[in-house]
């Protein structure tokens, strides 16, 4: 096979892959998100104020009032294999409505959104940070950005302050954005149907349950 034919075949492969991606993995637009919310295909409670929370292809979620902080001064390290270790090295802090939480530079905190989100078996959710907050050094997830088909609960935020100045977070502020992507077909086993799903129906920033993995 000549070099030109190889290049042509490579380009055709790229085109086919892109076609399959756009055919089966579409991100919902603002119009489709409104339809999904209206038909209860996607359920967000309390209902978002679309005038301020709906983006071109995402819904902004607001910060809840519950935080889980790490008490690093009492423990030298974390042992993920130890049962209930998080209860020993973390503590829950609840902030009053419209209250604030100060994140110090380099701090890592678990939090939840004010909203509960329910995703159908033929969609997945993806949590993203907001650019305006990212420019201040705030990240909203360290690794877990994907919410499986069938998810039902409050999304947990893995907040980190990468900057050199403290950041004041206010309960109820728009903290992150969630997009929704179509699957090629409905999941055979949605998240809430999984026997060993560790975080289904959560409504608080629960500690890591990695020790439960088989």
Go through each PLM region and give its residues.
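N-terminal amphipathic/basic-hydrophobic helices that include classical n-h-c signal peptides
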Residues: 1-25
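DUTPase catalytic domain/fold
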Residues: 16-214
